[in-house]
Amino acid sequence: VRLEATSEAATAETYAPPAAAGESFDWFSAWYPLRPVSFLDANEPNELRVLGKKLVAYLDPTCKEWRVLEDSCPHRRAPLSLGYVQKDGTLACRYHGWAFDGKDGSCVSIPMSVDEAAEKTACASPRSCATSYPSRVEDGILWVWPTAGADGLLASAGAPCATSLAREGTLPGEWGMVELPVGYAPALENQFDPSHAEWLHARYDAEGQLDERANAGFVAMTEFSVREGTMQKDGFVVEHGGYNKSNVGVSASRVFTAPCSSRSEYLDAKGKKYLSAAILYAPTEPGRTLMFTKFQAHQASAVQGAGARKVSPADRINSLVTAPATSLFDFYVDNFTSDPKLVRVGLSHGTPPGSSAYNLGDQDILAMHGVEVEMELQNKPWKQSYYLPTPADAGVSAFRNWMDKHAGGKVAWAPGVVDDASKVKSEAEQLDRYHRHTKHCVACKTALSELGVLEERCVAASKYLLAGGLFLAVTGAAFDQEAPAIIATCLAGASLVGAEKVRDMQHEFLSSVPRRGVPKPKLW
């Protein structure tokens, strides 16, 4: 059904009949993105989750292939993610040393066996095996099929990952990824609601000139529809026009490949490429969802609203004043850190200007969290809780109708996972950055670790310099030599200032809540 503005108020509220037999989406028969490969630690086990399943991924050093197992040792159910990767490609449990072949989960070593025969017998038992899952690397991402055993291997073998289905092909560049502290439904709704950007993110347009209460020149959407014949168990396609003055002439399509992929293509009025966006989602556990992003702007105006801020005269002055310290920090990173290249990647994620992307994420999260909590409190079907009277709401309606018709209305979690916890999270939890991104990214963890080392070195240097300054002050007084003491004391002060600056940098990786003053960020 095509939705267009008429003389009457257009509505996005449509009815989706229940799916017929065989038309239901199977949540456990699909590829899910786990991490960009660049985020994974190639030397250690990586703790992961999807659909409530606790998983561990590691790189087999013998064949350079990623293995995915259930994060549970069959011996005493300790997390295998606490273990270590051995040279022979097996994953050893740190609790009692049991070792597993990541390819099929078979147990290959039980160190506490009384003899070789007993070990062989125990390893041959199916009860000694860890649970392995089909996995693959595609488009720079590690994917998992969340059904184990022969059924999972057979079903996954011929099934493509969502990114390979994009008619326009994959996008260039690296994937970004965060774990949103909100559930799957509000996260996907946000993606199918493009007009929210003109209000929620209004102040962060590319020019940086808007008042915090202003919108970015919105244009009412007059067309937003589900492409005829596309609403099926495997997804759907929606088409819409522009929604602000910079993209008023565009035509866009958003292809939803269930359960995780939304690929958007924007064309300008002449049919030329305007903007491409690939966004992936994976429900990790109730109330948390992975989001992967990759964008390609084909025209300059397509970056409007991307979160940039106009450089002010104060910014330029500050840049000049801090230039010597910046150069010294760059020298330190290049010469005194464990992996300068990796540290720089982490710094580009976690510190300004790269960390400015957190501002937009914070805005989205606060809004989505509010929606999720209110829906929980009302405990009503979405059609009763939401009032969707405009064409701009058609994307949300389309997604909700797909969920109702084909996906059972909600995520199907792994056995034993119950979605009964309160959706209410404190503002500090919503604005947390460590669990949103840092802990998932090996570059950010490395950068944060190195900043901790630098802080300790700055504090130690200040102590030694201050002690030296006091000594030089005493001895210098006898010889009328005050300059060395003054220099040492100034350097001690500079080291303390440096340590405080490094603490500020570390905080950027941990939270959007300000480190000083009122614990509430200014987002608009």
Describe the role of every protein-language-model region.
Residues 100-107:
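Short metal-binding segments enriched for Cys and/or His
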Residues 62-65, 77, 143, 150-524:
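C-terminal catalytic domain of Rieske-type non-heme iron oxygenases
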